[in-house]
């Protein structure tokens, strides 16, 4: 039986799995396909990817839910399946992870520019993240993994949404370009300081 995630982190390095989409593409899935939908339509492929990472030694299995917010799913006419897709993603990850490994609820960027850089309001972003994270928590994840964020404001809304619905650990990953900053120009020393200030307690 696994111990709480934060306790495990205090004892040793924890190994996460890798990219889901890259391996689904290698298995013949088109890049134009909604990978999150495969939780419902081709679950065996999703589980194959999870199993490969577990066999390689991963301690953490990420749900196949990177793009499973309403704002992204509706681009594939799947906006009404947010809960169903996220619950299925967690279930598939847990079936492979079992009782000993951790399942991280994967939350990716919305694929939209947030204010003041774009038309999507912070409130809209927070609600989209909240809806997804609620389903991930309901499904039984051990932690929330906010992935590949470019905009610090978007990462903040995901953090706030996570705390709206849960006290689970939250991991935030930012995207760094070759020049050492995020695509929106934020340096690591600045976003780490800000994320520390926002860090849920």
PLM segments and residue spans:
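Domain-level signal for soluble alpha/beta catalytic cores
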Residues: 1-201
